[in-house]
Structures are given as C-alpha cells and as structure tokens.
Amino acid sequence: MSNFNFDFAENDFGPLAAKMRPTSLEQYFGQSHLIGEGKPLRKAIQAGHIYSMIFWGPPGTGKTTLAEIIAQRINAEVERISAVTSGIKEIREAIDRAKQNRLADRKTILFVDEVHRFNKSQQDAFLPHIEDGTVIFIGATTENPSFELNNALLSRARVYVLKSLTTAEIEQVLQQAVEDPKRGLGKERLILEENLLQVLAEYVNGDARLALNCLELMVDMADETENGKKIDRTLLKEVLGERQARFDKQGDRFYDLISALHKSVRGSAPDAALYWYARILTAGGDPLYVARRLLAIASEDVGNADPRAMQVALAAWDCFSRVGAYEGERAIAQAIIYLSVAPKSNAVYTAFNTAKQQAKDLPDYDVPPHLRNAPTNLMKELGYGTEYRYAHDEPNAYAAGENYFPPELKDTQYYFPTNRGMEIQIKEKLERLREQDKSAVKKRYK
C-alpha cells in the first residue's frame, strides 16, 4: 500500500510545509467555495459519501491535503500514484492492492497526482475500476481537465476547481507556522520585522507550500543573535530573489489576462490586445492557449464579417508549430492585430446558439419527405425525396419558393447578418433571395 499519511509533526527532519499539513477540515485554509459550512463537498465529506473527483488548481492550493483529509474521514486505504514517475505497471499494482482491500471490506482511494501527464491509454486503465467501485478515484491537476483529460474519465468524476489562496489566507498559514510549538516554529526565538509575513504572502501568489518553504529557508539562513533569530526584508529579498510576475496559469489572474485580451480584440483595440498578450507571455503563459482563443474569437466576434479571420488565426497557430516560439509568438501577435482591426459581427454566434436552443426545446419534427434520402425503391415508393428540386437545375442555382424547414418552422430565421464587412453583401444576397421566394409561383408551403 502506498499510504501517504506521514506524521511529520513527530519528525524533526520533515519539511515545514509537510509538518504543517492540515489533518482536518477545521485546520484547512482556503477553498471556502468548496468546503465552507453548508457547501455540498463539505457535507459529502462529513457524511462519508465520497465519489470520484478531480481537483484542478494551481500549485500549493491544497489538492493533496484535501485528498488526505477525505481518506482519513472515511477511513480508507490510500494508493498514491504520481504520473511523473509511474506507468501502467504501477497502476496495475495499485489496483491489485485495491482489490485485496475490497475483499477485506475496506475502501481504497486512488490518488493520482499530476494526472494530466498520463496519456490516453494510461487514463483509460482507471475506468473499469472506477466503474465497478474498486477504487474511489481522486486526481490532482494543474492543467485544464477539459483539454488534458479523456472525456471518459471526466464523465466518471466530478471536477472541483481550487483557487489560489488569498494573501490573507497565506498570512494565516504563515502565522500559524510561526506560533505552533509542536508542528511549526513556535519553539524558535524569531524576531520578525513588522509586516514581513504579509510581504511574503503577497509574493507567493496563493501558493501556501511555497510560502512555508520560503519561511523555513529564512529561519535556516538567519543569524542567531542574543535575542533570537532576526528575520527582516533584507533576508527575505535574499531568499526570494527577483520578483516573479504575478501570474498563475490556472488561477483567476490567468483568466483575467485572457479575458482582457479577448475583450480588447473584440473592442477593436489592437494596442491594448498586444499589451495583454505580452503580459501573458512575460508571465509564462502558453502561446498556444492564446492561439486557440483567437480561433474562438474569429468565429464568435468576427464571424462572416471577415471570414478570412479564421484562416489568419489558424495560420498563426500553424506557424507557431512549424517555426517554434520565437518566431511563432510574433505570428500570433500578427493574428491578434488582424482580428482586432477586422469588422466585427456576432451574428453567427447568436444564430447558432438560437438554433441549438430551439433544437433542444422544440419537438423533434419529422424531416419533410422532399428532403429525405431515398437510396432504395421502397423508400422511393414511400415518397422519400418526392418533388425535391435540385438547385443546380434551377435559374441561378436557386429554387425560388422552396423551403428546407419542417412546415412548423417554415418562416424561421436565425441568421441576421450585420451591416459590417462581408456581411453587407451576405445580407443583400439573402434579401434578394427572400424577395424571389415571395414572388415565386411554386411555393413549398402556402
């Protein structure tokens, strides 16, 4: 068994972050949106009704700790697998132990750290054992599960998003570590400069583990004086080095930057869009994530006002893949500028959403006979394809008066092109075709 509940409180050699690891929900800092009083996950943990789940969040937000607390709460055996160092062999061994636990009427939590690093076949290896209840699967990932995990695995697990801890929460974690005489630094004679813990908490961007590691390093490096160990900002700067960008790929700051980029492009502000793109890159963001977002923008915010926008966005993505980051980042910048100055239309976005909603809400109307496929004589005898008008045989390849909706929806219109860009011509053409329909002698529906 690969149980990961170690009592570092009794081990002077354990790292501070491990010693201070919470063992109950009451000791746990952060994630009040998930485990605050009355929240569904907290109720499930307290009731012992645990199901498979994925914890998605930045480093140091308590994913592993929460899994440990859950395991302790339901008195389950824990099999821990790291996707960085494990493969199919380790997965099979863990499953075999879980099967033995099941024979002994013991639950097993299979905790998979960095689960996004497993490939499709490795992820698939968990499915039958989740399905038959051999294990309760808990995966931890710093990457977006929608992109990194198989749909089959996602459908069998509830995804919970863990947020970066706030500065105040990190400061509480640090204060507890300073004061706790058993697990923390309470026995040390520390002389802390005023507001030092707050400065450290602001630096680590919501990563509690990093905060505790930095605190421990400062204590180790501090000189012993007559009154104790003095820890000031000079020592803090020495430990921290150059301040890093306040950025977290999976946290709110990341999505705030992406949102700012998207809104700048939508608002036809190329300079602002370039600024936010540069901020994302400087902070370590993935340029290909931006490239994917540009494809969505090309469809959602430009649409048929400039159909070339999609081609430009796709070409930028392709360029990045072919030439690498240095040149590829500039190609993405070019696409950002193009999309920013392109005429804007959300007519496609609105039309598609309306069509999807009606398809969901309205009855499943039959396909009219003239639109049905008729590959066999029987189908032809049943009237399939009867009176279908082949557009290419009609004047200007348009069957005036024909209708391709069920009769119940004959006058429906989803797509309303704007008066911008290419949609000006599209709108004019559709208006001409509708006038032909109105004046047509041969109409499908009266």
Swiss-Prot record:
Q: Which Gene3D superfamilies match?
A: 1.10.8.60, 1.20.272.10, DNA polymerase III clamp loader subunits, C-terminal domain, P-loop containing nucleotide triphosphate hydrolases
InterPro entries for this protein: AAA+_ATPase, AAA_assoc_2, AAA_ATPase_RarA/MGS1/WRNIP1, ATPase_AAA_core, DNA_pol3_clamp-load_cplx_C, MgsA_C, P-loop_NTPase
- SUPFAM superfamilies in UniProt: P-loop containing nucleoside triphosphate hydrolases, post-AAA+ oligomerization domain-like
Q: Which domain of life is it from?
A: Bacteria
Protein's UniProt keywords contain tRNA processing: no
Q: Which GO terms describe its biological process?
A: DNA synthesis involved in DNA repair; DNA-templated DNA replication
- One Pfam annotation reads MgsA_C
Per UniProt, ATP binds at G57, P58, P59, G60, T61, G62, K63, T64
Keyword list (alphabetical) reads: ATP-binding, DNA replication, Nucleotide-binding
Please provide, alphabetically and separated by semicolons, the GO molecular function terms listed in this UniProt record: ATP binding; ATP hydrolysis activity; DNA binding; enzyme activator activity; single-stranded DNA helicase activity
Q: Main role?
A: DNA-dependent ATPase that plays important roles in cellular responses to stalled DNA replication processes.
Q: Which family does it belong to?
A: Belongs to the AAA ATPase family. RarA/MGS1/WRNIP1 subfamily.
Protein name (database record) = Replication-associated recombination protein A
Supply the source organism for this entry.
Haemophilus influenzae (strain ATCC 51907 / DSM 11121 / KW20 / Rd)
Encoding gene per record = rarA
